[in-house]
Every structure is written in C-alpha cells, then in structure tokens.
Amino acid sequence: MKTVALIPIKLGSVRVPQKNIKPFFDGTPLMHFIQKACLEAKNIDEVYIYCSNEAVKDYVLPGVKFLKRPEYLDGDNINANDFIREFMNTVDADIYVNAHTTSPFAKPETIDECVEKVASGEYDSAFCAEALRTFMWEDGKPINFDPDHFPRTQDLPLIYGETSIAYVFTKESFLKHNRRLGSKPYIK
C-alpha cells in the first residue's frame, strides 16, 4: 500500500501573514517541523508540500517533494476537501495523510499509529484530537450539560476537539464520502 503525506501551504494567511515560513521558537521555519515528522514516520512513502507559490520551495526539506497547486485553491471559500481532491487527481496513493504546518509538535509515532489503524482496514480514516471533559457553552447557552442539574465534571460526556495534526484516509473512503473523514474514523 502506498501512503502519501500532503502538507498544504498557503503563504497568504489573513490572520498571520507568511506564518508557514516564519521562524518558530528556535529560529526554524514553522513548516520544517511537520515535514520532519512526516519524513521520520516509517509508514509514509512520499511527502509533498502543496502550494501555489513557488517561493515556498526555499523551505522544502530534502526528501520532500514540491507540487504546485492551482491558485484558485488559495481562495477564502476553499475547504480542505477541495484541495485534497485536486491533489489526489495528480498524486495517486492508497492512503493519504493530510498534515498541517500549524502542528509543530506532531510526532512521527502519532502519524504512524493513525496510518496503521487505517491500513488495518478496521477504520476508513483517522484524525488526532484532544479529549475534553469540561463545561461547554455556545451563544451564552450550555451545550453539554443542564445547569439546573449541574453534573460533576467526571459525569460530563467526553467531547473530542480536532487538533489538525494529521488526517489519514483511504482513497476509497475519500471518493465514497467526498471528505477526508469517512464513516468509521479512528480518533487518536
């Protein structure tokens, strides 16, 4: 089974301009950390930076391939599934890993575990998440508890918040569901 990592880069970030190439805590460009994690992951065969701006090539590590993506994929109304679909039209694989530069603490072992779970066939996709057991509110209203019957924290339902470290999915699952998370995801 061929497994390919896709690291999308957009240099035109609205909130933090040029964030992906900015030096991080030790002066290393932010995008180097996820590249290293993907290169060190034993279950990834190829790693790609997918960006419309060729200036990012100066920040691509040895062993990582650069693939220029169409500029329309930089639009504000484009979501992850849009650029993944376009990437899959160019780079064929059985399993894809969508990893993000904004996760500089990603570990190769975490990525490998997600790939192994999907490759086993037990799951059609996987993603990394933070387990939360806390009082959640939206628009001034509680969403996971009744304030009239205030529960103990340990009795609250466990909610998972995606961390965007890695999304792993089979080609088959993406084509069936038209999204990176299938119908039976593994949550790491």
State the predicted function of each range.
Residues 27, 51-55, 131:
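Residues in the short beta-alpha loop(s) of Rossmann-like NAD(P)-binding domains
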Residues 29-47, 58:
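A short, N-terminal amphipathic alpha-helix
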Residues 82-83, 104-186:
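Conserved core of the sugar-phosphate nucleotidyltransferase
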Residues 2-7, 31, 46-49:
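Hydrophobic targeting segments
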